[in-house]
Amino acid sequence: MKTTTLLLASVATLALALPAGAADPQLLVFDWAGFEEPGLFASYVEKHGQAPSYSFYGDDDEAFQKVASGFRADVAHPCSQMVSKYRDAGLIEPWDVSRIPEFANIDPEFLASPIFKDDAGVWYIPTDWGATAIAYNPDLVPADDVASLQVFLSPKYKGRTSLPDSSDDVWALAYLATGVTDWTVISEDQFKAAAAWLREAHKNVASYWADPAEMSQIMASGEVLVAWSWNDGVAYLQDDGYPVAFQREATEGSSSWFCGFINLKNGPGSEDKAYDFINSWLRPEAGPALLDAIGYGHTNAAAMALVSLEDRETAGLTEVNAPVLAQTPNDPAMRERQLAEFEQIKAGF
């Protein structure tokens, strides 16, 4: 793992939605803050002499709204459950996978949806994946307390928990906590039970974190003892020597997710350079670079083969003996309902 100070991580978040300077004006990548890692686009730089231009965001729905409102970029990096929104809005076009040699090495499980790949073409190139589970301070939180997701309701941790300001992640938590491990089909009763659980969990929340750097900071400060966290936030804390553990085997389980790149219609830059960029991302050497810099797994099986088991274990990316709710594409109408309900819950309603 790369040693990353919390200060530097927080500085990176200040670049949200701001284009990076001294970069190739012929390719604009709309991406999560922190993904402008040289190891991911090394072959692009070798070919073109400079890195792509970047514009950053911190939330999938925020990014979609910006693109839908007319923001122009060449490629964007949504997580899987957002792809249908971009397709339905007519904002993307298929990739020509004949121009992407490593496409053949992407683990098939990441493409197992007609939303990503159908008779019209390949609409999505999955690239990176991770886990969401319980991060906690083992010096102050007994392991027995985090054996269940109900720790987020415990009066013992009132004002000492944190949840992501991400509708998908909090609903994954709520569904798991109420016995649901597959969110592709959700009944009315399941939705209501999860919403009620979230309202109870909200009472314990000190803050909703916007990005892994923020989550790491509030845990490092001691303000928060238990958080529902992505694995990279845990890696930040580990690298900086703070006491943290990652519980992916709570009785009710944990969640997994993956993200990738879409080819935006009418991009302002070079289509050829968009393919050079995605080919750099998918080359096997990008696997260790991704894990080292950000803590995520790679969808290219050849890339993951270059990552040691020890590094996977440190990153929290090994197999677990517990349920896993995969954040695959779910019903768009239900997702919008969850988003609206989450905003109500955060507001105290």
Predicted stretch roles:
Residues 23-86:
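Early extracytoplasmic/lumenal segment of secretory-pathway proteins
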Residues 74-78, 208, 225-230:
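Paired acidic/hydrophobic, glycine-rich loop segments that form the ligand-binding mouth/hinge
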Residues 191-201, 240-265:
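Periplasmic-binding protein-like
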Residues 288-349:
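C-terminal capping/gating helix-and-loop segments adjacent to ligand/active sites or protein-protein/ligand interfaces
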